[in-house]
Amino acid sequence: MGLDIEMYGKEDRYLDFKEIEESLHDALFHTNNNWRSYLYLRKIRDYYLTNVEFDRDEIDKFIMDLENIKIFIPGDYDPALSELIKILSSHEIQKISIVGD
């Protein structure tokens, strides 16, 4: 069970969908406690309670949290995390909605 990210452009035009897979979520939140230091990561910790929207400024802060937590998770998750960061870094994306199951 992963988290779903829906991405939107200008005027709330739907762009794409990306999943934060369960294994990456576990690496971010269950293999260490450092996520508590990152405001935007704390917002997506709970599968069942997560239902957040980030505007472009918040997306950039979320990306910074992802970049900063990289050193605390196993290296085999680096490709998935780097891909997520690359996708979210597109400034065509103006808003994201992250929802759990």
Predicted regions and their residues:
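Acidic (Asp/Glu-rich) sequence patches and key acidic residues
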Residues: 1-101
